[in-house]
Every structure is written in structure tokens, then in C-alpha cells.
Amino acid sequence: TATMSAATQPETLTSDARYVCLDLLGAGAYGHVYRGMDRSTGTAVAIKIVELDMSTEELNAVQKEIHILSQVQCPFVTRMYDSFVVGMQLWIVMELCVGGSCADHARQGRLNEAHIAVILRDVLRALVYLHAEDMVHRDIKAANVLLYMDQHGTGIRVADFGVAGRLQQAHAKCERAFVGTPYWMSPEVIKQSSYNTKADIWSTGIMAIELAEGEPPYADLHPMKVLHLIPRNPPPQLSPTYSSAFRDFVAQCLTRDPAKRPTAAALLKHKFIRHAGSAVSILTPLAQQYKPLKHSASSQYAAAQTTDPPPLWEFASLRR
């Protein structure tokens, strides 16, 4: 567990406060996240705390996250329970996922194709829901896919809507915002051409490679170099050591032309996904053996860094 600094110490609450912060889990693009407790029920929760001395752009991004999460009703997306201001801090109370992120497990080399197929299936189910609601996540990556365990079983939740956006009819279902994390960005996002939900599909393909190999393509390069290479180079491919079905799934996700890139609903019918097994039987052992790494930067909602310097490729989500 990371050590709390004075800057990240939660505001002191009265003795009758409903929620209490316990240990620091990680730091995301807009705030710190703690393991906490709902004292009215004894339920463990995640509490994201955002300092309010921030720019209007940053505060608007956080408010967008709250607004979007409050509307989402999907079993494959993290649930938000409450939000309020404490002193000069905004507290966002949400579901605690105790099984670690898929980035944690991928970096430890624990994932085989059976694990990956189940994870991708549930990510696609989340995207089907979000895209039907005219939402684009725009930062799909393994650090934002969390494993959970509860009395009903084990599964995954797609997290971190800090940069997600609702598409508006007035914008012809297209946006020109430059957001996301460089290694997972689609060519059209980097070029800042109009794009839609298909940007999430490209990121899903990159994440599939990350799950298999422990890191995304170009992980050894500086993020600015990656932003130059992705639009110019051929799409990344999996090595022949993986099954043909898995390689074809990745290739379809990484179709360069977004108009020809399949939808999340279409990808759910892909052979690699159709043959995925039971989430409970396949993911439960993973979640049970999870132990946070000392230098792990991806606990709950950790997309940027912890108190330890992150590996180069864990580049903070760009905001502009």
C-alpha cells in the first residue's frame, strides 16, 4: 500500500460520517483512490478523492465522470454509489474491485488465451452497452479493466470514465477531442480526425496484445515517438505462437479504416469470443491469488502513477 502524503491525506470527517478512508490504493489522472468503508452497512468501497483546487477543465472532466457513472446500469461497468464535497475535496464512492486489474495479472504473466477470451468477452459486453448509449470510453486498456469477486461470482468491470464522453446528435455522432493513453490510441484519434465508437475497438485490440504479452506494442518507446508511429506503421500483430482465432480477432480490431472496423456486437460473434469459457471458473483463481505488486500502478482507477515512479509505458492519459 502506498504511503499517504500530506497532499493526499483525506479531509477529517466527523465521527458520524457515513464513509471512512482506509488505505491508499493508487493515483489516477484526476485523483487518489482509497479503500474505504460504508459504516452504515460495513460494505467495503473504493473512494476516489479529488482536490478541488484544479482547473475548470479538470473539474469538468471529473464531473463528467460522475454524471456518466451515475447513469450506467451495466453488470460489466463499475458501479458508482455516492458523491459529495468534503471541505475542499470531492469524494466519489464506488464499487471496490478486489481482484486487481488485468494489467496487474498480465504483467505477472498469468494470462493464457482462456483468460483473455473471457476478459475480452466481458469488455465487449460493456462496450455494447456504452456504445448503444452513445458513449465512447476512449481509454480502454488493461489497467482500466478490474477483476471483482462477490457472493454472486467473479467477473470483470470496465473502469475509469474520467475521459469518457457522450456523443451528441448535434456533432453527427463524432468528436474531435484528443484523449486517451498513447499506446492504446487509434490512428484516427492521434490524427484528430473525426471518430466515433470504433476508437474503443482499436484500443480493445491493443489491450488484447497487452493481455497476452504483458505490455502494449511500442512499450519500449517514448510516448511522443509512439504518437508518430501508430498512424504511419502497419497495425501491430500477434506472433504465430498464438491461435489463429486469437490472431484474427486482434487483426479485426486493428483494422486501420474505422468504417471497416467491426462493432463490439459483431466481435462478440467472433470464434475466439464465442468459445470463451465460464468467467467464474476461469477468473476466480486469478482474483484469489491477486496480491498487489510493490510497484504496481494499476489498482482501482490507477491510470497514471503511484508514489513509485511508473514504467515508461504507463503514460498518463492525455487531456487537452
Feature names for model-found ranges:
Residues 258-259, 265-320:
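C-terminal regulatory tails of eukaryotic serine/threonine kinases
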Residues 83:
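Activation-segment/catalytic-loop signature of the eukaryotic protein kinase fold
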Residues 32:
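Conserved N-lobe ATP-binding subsite of Hanks-type protein kinase domains
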